[in-house]
Regions:
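N-terminal loops that bind phosphate or other acidic moieties
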Residues: 1-138, 142-383
């Protein structure tokens, strides 16, 4: 009987990690019904982070709340309460920016006035509950506000030269003359999950690299926001060159200023959901994501899990929506591309669950063939 750990990331825009894991297991079981499956859907701090913890941690409880979304419209969401542990005797709150201030919550891009107020409101709710620790995923952001909305919801004030609060979002950054942190709520232990290493400002900064995704189109607009983020860094007394400070439109920097610690998303999630223990007696692990390409390197879920599998002596396998020509798949014993199985990317996107099941079946067959081949080779060796 084969023991398979299922640990895909989300297939962004199509299938959540939890659903992907189920579909892969169903496909494998169609070939090997007696196989044993351990579900550990993964995330790297972006979309699906809360769902990964909810699926992996027994006793996790959803805590519903309504927050001001990135456009100021109320959004019904939740944060996740994890049971008490030795390190967190009053429990851990898991919150992701994607479900409170994420770009998927917008009807249209709002580069100047989208902000992170909702994230701050969710953090405040978890603090009110009394948690010992916060785990915050900050992928999929909608704004480049430098985390000012989040900090404002936690009690900070960002003022112009006349002492009046500045406008929300990136629009207000250029007008910030002073920051009042006297009302800022104290931070518990805060771990910030991100796979981004970009600094806050400069050519690799939040505005230059990620601003266009959020609607900042012109060079002049990017320069204005970049200057505003630099000024914010001065007022918060943080180094704008800090790795990861540019994550989520500068929210990474704001969380560090609040007292948080940035951590590689995939590694932190894997540790907190007990993935190493799950792999200790596993034969194989299947991971995956929507697009496995030349950028799917260190820090991304599939590459991280391939290394973890090697350490545990398990076979690493990959199922991806597509696998590009520049992708390095040498860490995986077997690879299944949904696009190749479906015949086109359009067909794969139209029925992702169907083709994930097909990928699971393909991987089961190739694993069985490899095992049979190894047995044959072993039987032929002189005793």
């Amino acid at each position: 009987m084969t023991r398979v750990v299922l640990a895909p990331d989300s297939f962004k825009g199509t299938v959540a990690a939890v659903e992907a894991a189920v579909a892969l297991a169903e496909g494998w079981a169609s070939v090997e019904p007696e196989a044993e499956f351990v579900h550990r859907p993964m995330a790297d701090g972006g979309e699906g982070t809360v769902a990964a913890f909810e699926a992996a941690v027994p006793g996790a409880v959803r805590m519903p709340l309504a927050v001001d979304g990135p456009a100021g419209v109320r959004v019904d969401t939740f944060w996740l309460l994890l049971p008490p542990t030795v390190d967190a005797p009053d429990g851990t709150g898991v919150i992701d920016l994607a479900s409170t201030s994420g770009i998927e919550l917008l009807q249209e891009l709002r580069p100047w006035d989208a902000d992170t107020t909702g994230l701050g409101q969710a953090l405040a709710a978890a603090i009110d509950h009394g948690v010992s620790r916060l785990v915050v995923g900050i992928g999929s952001s909608a704004s480049t506000d430098g985390g000012t909305g989040m900090l404002s919801a936690l009690g900070a004030r960002f003022l112009d030269a006349t002492g009046v609060p500045v406008a929300r979002g990136a629009r207000g950054l250029a007008d910030i003359a002073s920051v009042d942190l006297t009302g800022l709520r104290a931070a518990p232990d805060v771990r910030v999950l991100t796979d981004v290493t970009n600094p806050l400002t400069g050519p690799r900064g939040a505005a230059a690299v990620f601003g266009p995704q959020k609607g900042l189109r012109s060079v002049d607009d990017i320069a204005i926001v970049d200057d505003g983020l630099g000024r914010l860094a001065e007022l918060l007394a943080i180094d704008p060159a800090g790795p990861g400070y540019g994550a989520a439109g500068g929210t990474g920097a704001a969380l560090v200023a609040w007292g948080g610690e940035l951590a590689p998303g995939a590694a932190e999630v894997a540790e907190l959901i007990g993935l190493a223990d799950a792999l200790s007696d596993a034969d194989a692990i299947i991971t995956g994501e929507g697009s496995y390409d030349g950028q799917s390197g260190d820090g991304k879920v599939p590459s991280f899990l391939a290394n973890l599998a090697a350490e545990a002596g398990a076979v690493a396998m990959l199922a991806a929506g597509r696998v590009t020509a520049d992708a390095d798949t040498s860490s995986f014993a077997d690879v299944a591309s949904l696009t190749a199985l479906a015949g086109s990317s359009e067909a794969a996107l139209a029925e992702p669950v169907r083709w994930l099941r097909a990928a699971g079946a393909v991987l089961a067959r190739t694993a069985a063939a490899r095992t049979a081949s190894a047995r044959t080779a072993s039987a032929g060796e002189p005793s």
